[in-house]
Amino acid sequence: MSLEVNIEKKLDGFTLRAAFTAGNTSTALLGASGCGKSMTLRCIAGIVKPDRGRIVLDGRVLFDSAQHIDLPPQQRGVGLLFQNYALFPNMTVEQNILCGLKAEKDPAARRAACAEMLRAMRLETLAKRYPAQLSGGQQQRAALARILVGKPRILMLDEPFSALDSYLREEVEGEVGSLLANFAGTALLVTHNRDEAYRLCKEMIVLNEGQVLRAGKTKEVFADPQSVAAARLTGCKNILPCTPLDSRTVRLDGWDTTLRLALPVPAGCTAVGIRAHDFTPCAADAPNAIPVKAVSTSENPFDWNLICTSPKGTAQLWWKVGKTSLSAAAPEPPQYLCAAPESIMPLKG
């Protein structure tokens, strides 16, 4: 299965220009709140009409402004899980699931499909309960069951963990991960959480103010986000302004030091990104050594955060150090930190 999207939609403050393809796998749409991620899903589902463009699913045109094609949602074969799950409050779990089988006219077949989905989603004992009687995780499973029973060609999840308490997220995330891995089709996950995107999806699309900044395999996007905005959205703490010297070398502005990169330095490179965990203490003459002065140390349950500045205090970077135990002592403040050439990401913008 494959999805092709190339649409425009004018929104408050910017114009959404979503152009991407998604194959038979799980793909994350990563971006800040209000960047157009959820609107993109609504356009694919047929809930919102784009101003112009084209949406094609498995060779079947769902929307084409030039050809005046705009299939209604019920004809698109799209399953969309809303942030609040959108269960019908006056219907039981079983009745909600049956709503996903309106196209099936045989009563016996409808009952059998509903029973099978109740078993698959571990909802058999909750079939007669109403949404208000369910936990957040149970509500999500019921909403997913209602979607999946209709056998959609594409599954889209809009911030599926946003309505859950933090203690439930890990458990439910594991269930959603299994669902995405086993779904026989295209799956899109909207999130602003880079960790969720990394754990759950093999492919990633990074959006910012309605524009696709970067698309590709998730690990490749994290390793080479290509732009300052995409690096920040993937959680890079250190965006260090630089001046390119040659195709593999840059000078860090404010640090009086040069860095050698494994990736080629592109035209228009204005900064390098180095993730906070990728630094190690080193000697002054080590490759890619950066002179630093630690000015702040804070402790998390599983790591230490050190904020360092250049010797003259004109620039700043973050260093994260993993802890071997909860009682591990803080690391000694370094005089120099270095990063391997493979860990240094050239960035535009």
Range-by-range predicted roles:
Residues 42-43, 203:
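The short alpha-helix immediately C-terminal to the Walker A/P-loop
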